[in-house]
Amino acid sequence: MEDFVRQCFNPMIVELAEKAMKEYGEDLKIETNKFAAICTHLEVCFMYSDFHFINEQGESIIVEPEDPNALLKHRFEIIEGRDRTMAWTVVNSICNTTGAEKPKFLPDLYDYKENRFIEIGVTRREVHIYYLEKANKIKSEKTHIHIFSFTGEEMATKADYTLDEESRARIKTRLFTIRQEMASRGLWDSFVSPREAKKQLKKDLKSQEQCAGSLTKVSRRTSPALRILEPMWMDSNRTATLRASFLKCPKK
């Protein structure tokens, strides 16, 4: 699973997922399913905000990356992917500026057009079940919830899907592709079922033991783009690189 994640997701997303797991004391070598889930959630959050801006009239517009309109305001503020301290700093700043009610839990995005925080969910289960779990946890009508599944289903607060149909279709297509690629590598069942995940982990550990005697040369290269952008990747151009380089899963 770890190899699959590194092949199929943008290196910057992988880096952010690694940092998130390290912050919470989780080992990605063991919790590979969580590693994949975090990367998937991050990518959906970035895709959700992709190309969406607010013009001078306060209207939401879609602008392609090649468009020279750099002065347009991003419609969405990305909160997910930041360390907790910085994330809460951003949330507090938004609340002070807009008058929005401070959420109890860290949300994923803020929508400047609708003036609301958004919680994004990506589930391997039924969307309505996951939606209810999110709603029960958040317990706030102020935070908008939008759930996507790997089967193309979605559910949102008051059936308000925020984005246009084409933007949502991009997200659904990407999730379906991830599912298909996992399935082609025999990883999907373990990703969905914790019991299957434990079996897969035992197989992986056994395989590692068998290979322990052989020397392996591992590349530890750091992406030049990541060196340049970090820690500035969340500035006004924070998603430019990500927009241009979402990686497709290579063929098996």
Swiss-Prot record:
Site (Important for efficient shutoff activity and nuclear localization) location in chain: R195, K198, K199
Record site feature (Important for efficient shutoff activity), residues: K202, K203, K206
UniProt keyword list: Decay of host mRNAs by virus, Eukaryotic host gene expression shutoff by virus, Host cytoplasm, Host gene expression shutoff by virus, Host mRNA suppression by virus, Host nucleus, Host-virus interaction
Keyword Transcription: no
Residue positions of the active site: E80, D108
Subcellular location: Host cytoplasm; Host nucleus
Keyword Aminoacyl-tRNA synthetase set for record: no
UniProt-listed GO biological process terms: viral RNA genome replication; viral translational frameshifting
Pfam families the record matches: Flu_PA (PF00603)
GO MF term (any one): RNA binding
Main location, first listed in the record: host cell
Role of this protein: Plays a major role in the shutoff of the host protein expression by cleaving mRNAs probably via an endonuclease activity. This host shutoff allows the virus to escape from the host antiviral response. Hijacks host RNA splicing machinery to selectively target host RNAs containing introns for destruction. This may explain the preferential degradation of RNAs that have undergone co- or post-transcriptional processing.
Family: Belongs to the influenza viruses PA-X family.
UniProt domain comment: The probable endonuclease active site in the N-terminus and the basic amino acid cluster in the C-terminus are important for the shutoff activity. The C-terminus acts as a nuclear localization signal. The C-terminus is recruited to host protein complexes involved in nuclear Pol II RNA processing.
Protein name: Protein PA-X
Organism name: Influenza A virus (strain A/Chile/1/1983 H1N1)
Lineage, highest ranks first: Viruses, Riboviria, Orthornavirae, Negarnaviricota, Polyploviricotina
Encoding gene (name): PA
